[in-house]
């Protein structure tokens, strides 16, 4: 394996572990709000909360990113990047657009 590939995989694992640890912490602090912010179903949130540190590390070792870029809708991405509405109104609009997205389920 090339050094660049190895470095990229190490970076993916690091991002995955950081994401999983952050998600667990968020869920512990405010379960309902975190499910909304993360786009998790109740089942996914429950599974993630029950994972041990060793299981988190194993899951993070995937060669694929575990987090997903949720801003794949042009109107949502535009709402977050263009200062058309300004400040709080723009943030509220983005939150409404995010709330319309379906919750992710395990396939």
UniProtKB/Swiss-Prot annotation:
The keyword Membrane does not apply. GO terms for cellular component: cytoplasm. It is found in: Cytoplasm. Keywords: Activator, Bacterial flagellum biogenesis, Cytoplasm, Disulfide bond, DNA-binding, Transcription, Transcription regulation. GO terms for molecular function: DNA binding. GO terms for biological process: bacterial-type flagellum assembly; positive regulation of DNA-templated transcription; regulation of bacterial-type flagellum assembly. Pfam families: FlhD. Belongs to the FlhD family. Functions in complex with FlhC as a master transcriptional regulator that regulates transcription of several flagellar and non-flagellar operons by binding to their promoter region. Activates expression of class 2 flagellar genes, including fliA, which is a flagellum-specific sigma factor that turns on the class 3 genes. Also regulates genes whose products function in a variety of physiological pathways. Homodimer; disulfide-linked. Forms a heterohexamer composed of two FlhC and four FlhD subunits. Each FlhC binds a FlhD dimer, forming a heterotrimer, and a hexamer assembles by dimerization of two heterotrimers. This is Flagellar transcriptional regulator FlhD.
